Amino acid sequence: MSLENKNIIITAGGTGGHIYPALAIAELLRQNKANVTWVGTPNNMEASIVPEYFNIQFIKSSGVRRKGIIKKITFPLKLAYNTLKSRSLLKKLKADLVIGFGGYVSGPICLAAAQINIPVIIHEQNAKIGLTNRILAKFATTICLAFEIENLHKQFSSKQLAKTKIVGNPVRKEIVALNDKARIYTDSSTLKILVLGGSQGAKAINEIIPKLIQKSNEQGINIKVWHQTGKLSLEETKDAYKDISQNHIKDIAAFIDDMAIAYNWADLVICRAGALTVSECAIAGLPAIFIPLPSAVDDHQFFNAQNIVNNNAGFCLRQQQMTLENLLAIIKPLNQDRSKLEQMSKMAKKTLIKNSSEQILDCVKKILNNK
């Protein structure tokens, strides 16, 4: 089925974990000649990222979780108001279908679409279903999940389960391309470690990695690090590296512009376990040491990592377990026997769904074909 002249609304916002999978789908829809419009919030990350690629409309929306009593009282009124505004926007855009990728903005847009009989697809990136998507699941035409979710039958009705499909996380095409490339781990003198702190940085990771490099050198492990610190911790982290030879540092930067190059360079990654990072590591076949964010809602980052860990393709340390001793206990054997990294790489590639974007595109075409 052709999507030519079909008006498809993408709604996602707040964090890169919502935005980048949505961008991958939006680009594929555009390649299939659909008219794509993005709906986000004006003060979040999507406002600075999306306009370079797609037309974006804004709805002011915020969440209620962990907020004060006043905001909890006024939240239903704000949601109703934003839903009415969203209905008007969807009618103006002559929307044929809405795809929600999470973030608070997805709530009013997807609710409005359901109210005026516009089909809705929602996509959950994490291994725990977020509050917004738990609510929207009742109204969605199709529910797409990135991971198998524990005890899903206790969270969804039989009707909701019947319209649920596991599709994986959409990943940028340049990272998907790494899936076809075999990683060759030679017993060279240098172990290349990529450190990812996420867009906001990870203070605990940023603090321990320079100490890890120093300790490794003392024990004869030659590590070279490419360290993405996040925007808040760059100078502080650079200062922690001041006594470490430049021979052990590839780069220290707030952001990495081309993640495909970084993934391709690395032998091993140390990172949080956000859904997108986990999926990208798996598709790229990159062994990982995951340090889940302790404050993640419903501990979802810990659960995101479990599929890779259970398939012997990575490790997971709680933040309180992230000591020099525990990190070295993982890194030493991998450094001594690089074939272990090669085996982990092969297993990682088997854990994630490679054609996630195409599966979601297929859902779009089936819904519009039956509309």
From Swiss-Prot:
Catalytic activity: di-trans,octa-cis-undecaprenyl diphospho-N-acetyl-alpha-D-muramoyl-L-alanyl-D-glutamyl-meso-2,6-diaminopimeloyl-D-alanyl-D-alanine + UDP-N-acetyl-alpha-D-glucosamine = di-trans,octa-cis-undecaprenyl diphospho-[N-acetyl-alpha-D-glucosaminyl-(1->4)]-N-acetyl-alpha-D-muramoyl-L-alanyl-D-glutamyl-meso-2,6-diaminopimeloyl-D-alanyl-D-alanine + UDP + H(+)
Molecular function, one GO term: UDP-N-acetyl-D-glucosamine:N-acetylmuramoyl-L-alanyl-D-glutamyl-meso-2,6-diaminopimelyl-D-alanyl-D-alanine-diphosphoundecaprenol 4-beta-N-acetylglucosaminlytransferase activity
Subcellular location: Cell inner membrane
Keyword Cell cycle listed: yes
Entry's transmembrane regions: none
InterPro entries listed in its UniProt record: GlcNAc_MurG, Glyco_trans_28_C, GlycoTrans_28_N
Function field: Cell wall formation. Catalyzes the transfer of a GlcNAc subunit on undecaprenyl-pyrophosphoryl-MurNAc-pentapeptide (lipid intermediate I) to form undecaprenyl-pyrophosphoryl-MurNAc-(pentapeptide)GlcNAc (lipid intermediate II).
Domain of life: Bacteria
Pfam family, one: Glyco_tran_28_C
Membrane topology summary: Peripheral membrane protein
PANTHER family in alphabetical order: GLYCOSYLTRANSFERASE, UDP-N-ACETYLGLUCOSAMINE--N-ACETYLMURAMYL-(PENTAPEPTIDE) PYROPHOSPHORYL-UNDECAPRENOL N-ACETYLGLUCOSAMINE TRANSFERASE 1
Source organism: Francisella tularensis subsp. tularensis (strain SCHU S4 / Schu 4)
Name of the protein in its database record: UDP-N-acetylglucosamine--N-acetylmuramyl-(pentapeptide) pyrophosphoryl-undecaprenol N-acetylglucosamine transferase
Tagged with keyword Signal: no
Pathways involved: Cell wall biogenesis; peptidoglycan biosynthesis
Biological-process GO terms, alphabetical: carbohydrate metabolic process; cell division; cell wall organization; lipid glycosylation; peptidoglycan biosynthetic process; regulation of cell shape
Gene3D superfamilies in alphabetical order: Glycogen Phosphorylase B
Protein family (similarity comment): Belongs to the glycosyltransferase 28 family. MurG subfamily.
Annotated residues for binding of UDP-N-acetyl-alpha-D-glucosamine: 15-17, 126, 172, 199, 256, 275-280, 301
Keywords: Cell cycle, Cell division, Cell inner membrane, Cell membrane, Cell shape, Cell wall biogenesis/degradation, Glycosyltransferase, Membrane, Peptidoglycan synthesis, Transferase
